[in-house]
Amino acid sequence: MFRSSRMPFDLFAPPYDRLIPLEAVDDLVGEPKLWPGVSLIWHLGRGKPTRDLGPALHRPGGVSLFVVLPPSPRLRQNPDIFRIVESCRPHSILPFHEEPDATEIASLFARPPMDLPSQVTDYLTWRGIQVDLETRRLVRRTVELSDEVSTVSALSRRLYLSRRALGRRFYNAGLPVPSHLLHFSRVLRAAIRLQRTSDSVATVGNALGYADGFALSNQMHRLTGIRPTEVRSRMGWEWLVEAWLRTERAEGGLRATLRGAPADGAADGADRQARGQDERRAHRNRWHGSDRGSLDGPSERAS
C-alpha cells in the first residue's frame, strides 16, 4: 500500500502552475485575511482523515477545498471517509493519485458552479449563517432571480412579498438588506463570466444590464472591495462571496456571526449599541427608499 511521509495538505494559488506544500497548517486555520483565488488540497492518503479534519473543516472562509481520495484498500478499510469529507463542503473530490496534476485541478477550479443559487446558499450556511427554511428559500431565490431582475421592487414582485416584508425577513435573520444580496449576485455572475471568457468588462456589464464597464467595476468594488482585473486573474467564486460578507460585516450590514470571526470585532458594548441603532435606521430607510440608490443597478430589463 502506498504511504507518503509528506504533509497531507497543499495550497493551490496563482499562477496555478504547481501545488505548494503546506507544512505549517496551523498558520492557515483561523487566519483572518482573505485568500483570493486560493484552494486547499487535502491528500487523504498522506495522513489520518480524523486527525487532519480540523484544518479542512476550519479553513479560512473563501478557501475552496479539493479532496484527493486515498488508495482503494484504505477506502474499504474506512467507510466513514466520505462522511468526514462531506462535512467539510469540498469543491471537488478527486480519485487517488500520488502526485495530482496542477492542470487537472485548475480545470476543475475554473468550472462555474452548476447551481449557483444553491451553492451560494450552502456557502452561507457553511460560514455559520443559520436561517430558517423560508429565509433560506428567499436567499436562494434572490440569487436565482439576479439573472432576470435588477431592482428590489422587481425582486419583491417575483417573490410575492412587499419590500417591507422582504426587508424585515432579512433583517431579523441578521442578513444584509435584500438589495445588497441582489446586486452582489449580479456582480458574482459577472465575475464568473469574466473568469471564463475573454469578454471585456464593458461587454460583460452590458450583457447584465449595466450602462458600461465602469458601472460594473464600481459596483463590484463598492460591494466587495475587488476590481474586475483581480477577479479575472484568479479562479473560484467562494472568495468573492467571502469578500462581500466581510465588507457587509465591516459596514454593519451583516449582523449574523461568521464562523471563526469575533462576535463583533473589537467594538465595546457602547459601540455595539450605537451601531445597532444606526443599522435599524439604515434598514428602515432602505425599505422605504427608492430603488435608485447608489448601490442599485439599471432599471429592470424588459421581458
Give residue spans per PLM region.
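DNA-contacting interfaces and partner/effector-binding or oligomerization modules
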Residues: 3-120
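Membrane-topology and secretion signals of cell-surface/extracellular proteins
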Residues: 18-30, 48-55, 79-81, 186-189, ...
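Short, Lys/Arg-enriched, Trp-marked, Pro/Gly-tolerant hinge/linker segments that flank
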Residues: 109-158, 171-184
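Basic, amphipathic alpha-helical hairpins
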Residues: 137-151, 170, 174, 191-200, ...
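Basic/polar phosphate-binding segments, predominantly the helix-turn-helix DNA-binding elements
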Residues: 149, 153-180, 205-230
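Terminal helix-turn-helix DNA-binding modules in bacterial transcription factors
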Residues: 173-208, 234-263
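Structural motif
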Residues: 32-34, 57-58, 83-86, 130, ...
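…primarily DNA-binding HTH/wHTH and HhH modules…
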Residues: 218-303
